[in-house]
Amino acid sequence: MTRVTAQLCKALLLAAIATFASIAAADPDETDPDLAKRDADYAAGKALADKKDWAGAVLLFERAERRYPDHADLQNNQGYAYRNLKQYDLAFLHYRRAIELDPRHRGAHEYIGEAYLLTGDLASAQRHLAALKNICVLPCEELKDLERAIAEYRGPK
């Protein structure tokens, strides 16, 4: 191998490592972090969700959804707010829509898996755990969180 070829291979390897690292470190709730900059209702809904004002967050997310019905992050956040209101049917509707829009949305797979556990459906939670195992190239927080939730659901061995 020539010196130039070796340097090129090294550069390509470093670029690949950087790409995979950025994928693994991405925030699951923000596959499009610019939506909060573009839409005041979405940003305000996220702020209310951070304060655990789930009903207020839902109202603002619904307004933002009129403008961005096909936004996976928005659907995921709506599902999370509905889940915390214990409105599981609506939570599942939005989580499924997020996954339909972005089948690799790690946050949606984690959150829907946790919602299935809250409704006693371990088998469905395990399906989303399997999806996360396929999605996460490197270990990811969403996979670990859902594994932990399933272990807690099962109880001590």
How would you name each of these model-derived features?
Residues 2-4, 29-38, 126-157:
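Terminal, low-structured helical/coil segments at or just beyond the last alpha-helical repeat
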Residues 38, 72-73, 106-107, 139-140:
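Helix-start (N-cap) detector for alpha-helical repeat units in TPR-like alpha-solenoids
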Residues 67, 101, 134-138:
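Structural marker of alpha-solenoid helical repeat scaffolds
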Residues 77, 111, 145-149:
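Canonical tetratricopeptide repeat
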